């Protein structure tokens, strides 16, 4: 049979003077668009801080100018005697290097595969770059707040960063989402005033926090949702604005930037979020509730914007697709940055370390029931338990009790939020007449 003639080659660039060697040339632009879309969708800091592009060089300078004061001039006095110089300094942000993410798609695997993986690969490339950029910006924001007293102002008198500690409620606990949300809102009230005292503009203020704390703020506002229609959308569970801050939930709040390896704990991480709080480290992973800022607090310098490159790896019979950018991140204005932290001694809710049941064995007759409760250790851990039965036709757990359904043996198992289990063996005998 003769070879088939014709057939569309949609990916080949067949324009006049163009090379047709690359069969995927026209597909590349779609792929690149998907990377850009994924980056824009995932990044939460890019539209909320200072961005500056440079054509060449290894760094960018941001001038800082201080303030002066006015004074009355009496007859006969000389302005030279009253003049006060306006102080100057600068902040410099250096390019971190070339950040990359790539995939290698082998021809044979691509041919045998029955579903499209490129769309998901593109999303992962874009999201990895976005999370690295976000992590770096947020780590720099935390770094501003942690500046030592000797350097926590660009120029003396311009203002210092603000660190606010949640106040424990007189009744209830910060482990209660509603109480936690109320406490965060109370500190955002103080944060608003702190920035304004530093002459930080009222617009473009942002509060970054974790999904747990974001949900806590929602829980605190929800009972009065009718009165807060301008602040939140109860139907979608989103917050628009609290105390002049755009509230943004960030799952990767404390992840930090990229490193020299692509492991979960990268080597030589360039912008690491502080791990442990101390007398000198006010904000760290173990106590941060959220970071607040004006968009001028942190800056990013772009040498090479997000771009895509595809290379044919003939020796591997594969296509390599690379997403990359060259940027640098750094703090600019300490007076426009701040953080809310947990009180000393109050930390992240610990994971359960064990679970025990009120009974290890139980004997019932058909139709009877008996209480069975579980206790999670430690007491301040997540106390939620999920219950299951190995034989639901014999016995089940319902509303704190084991209910006997039929003759036989069943194991009633309680499982903690992190997968620890405890079981009670239940024997069900026939009911006597």
UniProtKB/Swiss-Prot annotation:
Keyword Protease: no
GO BP annotations listed: viral translational frameshifting
Pfam families: Big_2, Gp10A-like
KW Transport (keyword) present: no
GO CC annotation: viral capsid
Superkingdom of origin organism: Viruses
Sequence ranges assigned to domain BIG2 in this UniProt record: 353-419
Subcellular locations according to the entry: Virion
Keywords for this protein: Capsid protein, Virion
Main location per the UniProt record: virion
Note: The minor capsid protein is produced by a -1 ribosomal frameshift near the C-terminus of the ORF coding for the major capsid protein, producing a protein with a C-terminal extension compared to the major capsid protein. The major capsid protein is produced by conventional translation of the same ORF.
Subunit description: Interacts with the connector protein and the major capsid protein.
Function, in words: Assembles with the major capsid protein to form an icosahedral capsid with a T=7 symmetry, about 60 nm in diameter, and consisting of 415 capsid proteins. The major and minor capsid proteins are incorporated into the capsid in about a 90/10 ratio respectively. Once the capsid is formed, encapsidates one single copy of the viral genome.
Family, similarity comment: Belongs to the T7virus minor capsid protein family.
Official protein name in the record: Minor capsid protein
Gene from which the chain derives: 10
């Amino acid at each position: 049979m003769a070879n088939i003639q014709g057939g569309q080659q949609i990916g080949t660039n067949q324009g006049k003077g163009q090379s047709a060697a690359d069969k995927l040339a026209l597909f590349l632009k779609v792929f690149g668009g998907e990377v850009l879309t994924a980056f824009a969708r995932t990044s939460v800091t890019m539209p909320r801080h200072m961005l500056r592009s440079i054509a060449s060089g290894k760094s960018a300078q941001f001038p800082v100018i201080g303030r002066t004061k006015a004074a009355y001039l009496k007859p006969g006095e000389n302005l030279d005697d009253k003049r006060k110089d306006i102080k100057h300094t600068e902040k410099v942000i250096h390019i971190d290097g070339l950040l990359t993410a790539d995939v290698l798609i082998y021809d044979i695997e691509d041919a045998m595969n029955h579903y499209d993986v490129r769309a998901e690969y593109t999303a992962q490339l874009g999201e990895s770059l976005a999370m690295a950029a976000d992590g770096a910006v947020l780590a720099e924001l935390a770094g501003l707040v942690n500046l030592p007293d000797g350097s926590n102002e660009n120029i003396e008198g311009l203002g210092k960063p603000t660190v606010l500690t949640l106040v424990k409620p007189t009744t209830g606990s910060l482990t209660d989402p509603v109480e936690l949300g109320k406490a965060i809102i109370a500190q955002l009230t103080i944060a608003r005033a702190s920035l304004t005292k530093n002459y930080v503009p009222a617009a473009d203020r942002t509060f970054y926090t974790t999904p747990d704390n974001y949900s806590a703020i929602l829980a605190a506002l929800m009972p009065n949702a009718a009165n807060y229609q301008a602040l939140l959308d109860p139907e979608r569970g989103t917050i628009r604005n609290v105390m002049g801050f755009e509230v943004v939930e960030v799952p990767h709040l404390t992840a930090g930037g990229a490193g020299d390896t692509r492991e979960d704990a990268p080597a030589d991480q360039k912008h690491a979020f502080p791990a442990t709080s101390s007398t000198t480290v006010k904000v760290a992973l173990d106590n941060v509730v959220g970071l607040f800022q004006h968009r001028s607090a942190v800056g990013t310098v772009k040498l090479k914007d997000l771009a895509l490159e595809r290379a044919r790896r003939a020796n591997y019979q594969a296509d390599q697709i690379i997403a990359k950018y060259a940027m640098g991140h750094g703090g600019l204005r300490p007076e426009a940055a701040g953080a809310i932290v947990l009180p000393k001694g109050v930390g992240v809710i610990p994971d359960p370390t064990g679970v025990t049941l009120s009974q290890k064995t139980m004997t019932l007759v058909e139709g009877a029931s008996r209480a069975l409760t579980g206790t999670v250790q430690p007491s301040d851990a997540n106390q939620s338990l999920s219950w299951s039965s190995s034989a639901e036709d014999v016995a089940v757990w319902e509303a704190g009790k084991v209910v006997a359904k039929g003759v036989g043996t069943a194991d009633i198992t309680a499982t903690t939020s992190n997968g620890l289990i405890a079981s009670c063996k239940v024997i069900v005998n026939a009911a006597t007449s």
